[in-house]
């Protein structure tokens, strides 16, 4: 089965089938809001490539994200195979959480590299030791992302240690995270690790949290011109 993430057209079609609303993405999130989420993702997750390079000893490339609207049911229908779900909760600066989803086979490559291998020993189960190795990589990655986000939003932001869970979309639900038919935001990134991994990761978040992030960015944008005007006024005096 093709493991590429959903295209915009596929998501729109699936969303239309689920709730009977055409152009659902524009209704739920405006183009400006999606652009803002893309900018946030690009600066926060995108800049963590340097951190991963240090950990994995391979060149890491994370591309500009694609922001789309989907549901868990839609994802389950398209990707009936194992993933590792990485839950990240904000403990300071922001209120909420999001879920990073990586394919299990990609997690095995990361685990092998973290444990000193060359990334090819992937015909193994993700036992506690390997899951811990993946967790450390995700902790460093999301910590770097939080630092970048803190700089971007000009406020202190802290996160809790990521919690990892193995999820098989063919048989499991994301109970405790999202409802099966809940409309959510999917911020997807293409990630390359040397010649070993050419895949994608998904950052899933509730609509409310996505809008919450955008509001923080908008508030910052509105504050900056006001501060500049005050400085100009003081200079003229």
Regions from the language model: what does each represent?
Residues 2-12, 16-17, 26, 30, ...:
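Composition-driven recognition of glycine/serine/threonine/acidic- and proline-rich low-complexity segments
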